[in-house]
């Protein structure tokens, strides 16, 4: 019997499974549509998309599925100050540009935050769910999202952040444990202090806020989903598990790295974007953050813009040592399969665990 929770009932899902909204190309229309059609909640990771791209992707997705889907943006952040001396950052990346046949790197310009325009496009996307990370949305944005009848989800890495999100008006909170791959959602605490594991974080957040909680971080199979529900979550959000699906839009070199990695081979890094994110350790991470490279990382999002040409070229050339190999600590459990097969397997496994535990009680 399918597992049902307050969240599955509210969102019209068959399973308490959410495909994480991974920005940067992973969440293709094929992936999101397959996840939704399988009865889970698929997400468009739209943080790096332009408004026209958001419109195009949403239109294509609506043509593929009539089931609920979500869209995700980064909360607007203050514009970073360009360092007076950015030479160390440019000098650190320059040899890699030469190695991949790229022109010398240039200092990225401080660009305006695209959130306002992205939000306008997201409101017209047809998504049933809107989620965000990196902070709290402006009150006007929350009002606009609610006016469209969209279910609103924020991301927390501490109880205090969860309480702040609930007070701002979110309908549910993602409790992102330290095991999670990619960027940390921390916004109201020191990054290191907010490195709380999923098993410890989820029940504390569930006790602290009255809205549904979504567990995230290191969950890769039905055992993790069942555990999340037992801890008080209403669903499990999974990213790394979906990155190795056939439909995921990451480079083959990234998929191969995930499938060959072990749990001790990921760590937090600022090397690629300037903001702490968990990925599989590679040459770029080791060398850019090495002891001989002080001051070689620009603040987010400048570092992200600086390294983008390198990452793009590396993807085309199959050079995993220069890719941001985002992955969580559950990486050893990753499998290569279709998104539909993954959702079906996760649901079957979770239901079996719940039955087994109930039978032994």
Predicted features by range, described:
Residues 94, 183-188, 192-214, 219-361:
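Conserved active-site-proximal phosphate/metal-binding subdomains
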Residues 1-208, 346:
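Active-site entrance/lid segments in N-terminal catalytic domains of soluble metabolic enzymes
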């Amino acid at each position: 019997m399918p597992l049902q929770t307050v969240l599955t009932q509210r969102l019209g899902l068959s399973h308490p499974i959410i495909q994480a909204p991974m920005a940067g190309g992973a969440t293709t229309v094929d992936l999101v549509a397959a996840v939704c059609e399988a009865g889970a909640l698929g997400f468009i990771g739209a943080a790096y998309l332009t408004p026209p791209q958001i419109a195009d992707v949403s239109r294509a997705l609506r043509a593929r599925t009539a089931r609920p889907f979500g869209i995700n943006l980064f909360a607007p952040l203050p514009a970073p100050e360009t360092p007076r001396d950015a030479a160390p950052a440019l000098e650190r990346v320059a040899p890699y540009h030469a190695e991949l046949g790229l022109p010398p790197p240039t200092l990225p310009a401080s660009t305006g935050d695209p959130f306002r325009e992205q939000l306008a496009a997201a409101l017209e996307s047809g998504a049933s769910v809107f989620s965000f990370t990196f902070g709290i949305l402006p009150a006007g944005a929350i009002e606009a999202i609610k006016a469209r009848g969209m279910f609103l989800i924020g991301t927390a890495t501490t109880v205090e952040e969860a309480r702040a999100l609930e007070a701002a008006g979110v309908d549910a909170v993602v409790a992102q444990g330290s095991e999670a791959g990619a960027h940390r959602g921390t916004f109201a605490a020191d990054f290191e202090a907010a490195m709380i594991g999923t098993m410890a974080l989820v029940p504390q957040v569930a006790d602290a806020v009255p809205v549904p909680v979504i567990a995230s971080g290191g969950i890769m199979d039905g055992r993790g989903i069942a555990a999340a529900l037992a801890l008080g979550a209403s669903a499990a959000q999974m990213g790394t598990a979906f990155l190795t699906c056939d439909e995921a839009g990451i480079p083959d070199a990234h998929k191969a790295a995930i499938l060959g990695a072990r749990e001790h081979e990921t760590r937090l890094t600022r090397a690629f974007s300037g903001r702490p994110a968990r990925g599989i350790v590679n040459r770029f991470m080791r060398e850019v953050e090495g002891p001989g490279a002080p001051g070689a990382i620009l603040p987010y999002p400048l570092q992200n813009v600086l390294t983008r040409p390198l990452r793009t070229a590396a993807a085309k050339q199959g050079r995993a040592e220069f890719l941001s190999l985002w992955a969580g600590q559950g990486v050893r459990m990753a499998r290569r399969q279709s998104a539909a097969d993954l959702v079906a397997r996760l649901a079957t496994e979770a239901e079996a665990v719940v039955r087994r535990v109930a039978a032994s009680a």
